[in-house]
């Protein structure tokens, strides 16, 4: 059966990393890849359609910092 968008609830990172509460069926907090266990310090997880690779246990502040545009210097803001 092909993967359809909107068939599963969205998950968003929680402050301090992903919570093990409310995981979708079939996903576990101990991710495996090609039969090998991943490092407990950095876990990778693929979405159900295998389109994206997610790094778990990343604080929300990291995602917020990635979305901000680079700050401009005061010279660029007030040219003479």
Curated annotation (Swiss-Prot):
Region (Disordered) residue spans: 1-44
Classification via Pfam families: UPF0731
InterPro entries attached to this UniProt entry: FAM229
Family designation: Belongs to the FAM229 family.
PANTHER family hit by this protein: PROTEIN FAM229A (PTHR35355), PROTEIN FAM229B (PTHR35355:SF2)
Name listed for the protein in its UniProt record: Protein FAM229B
Organism field: Bos taurus
């Amino acid at each position: 059966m092909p993967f359809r968008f909107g068939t599963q609830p969205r998950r968003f990172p929680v402050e301090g990393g992903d919570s093990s509460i409310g995981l979708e069926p079939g996903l576990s907090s101990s991710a495996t890849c090609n039969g090998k266990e991943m490092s407990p310090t950095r876990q990778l997880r693929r979405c159900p359609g295998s389109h994206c690779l997610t790094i778990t246990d990343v604080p929300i502040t990291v995602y917020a910092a990635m979305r901000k545009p680079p700050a401009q210097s005061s010279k660029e803001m007030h040219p003479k």
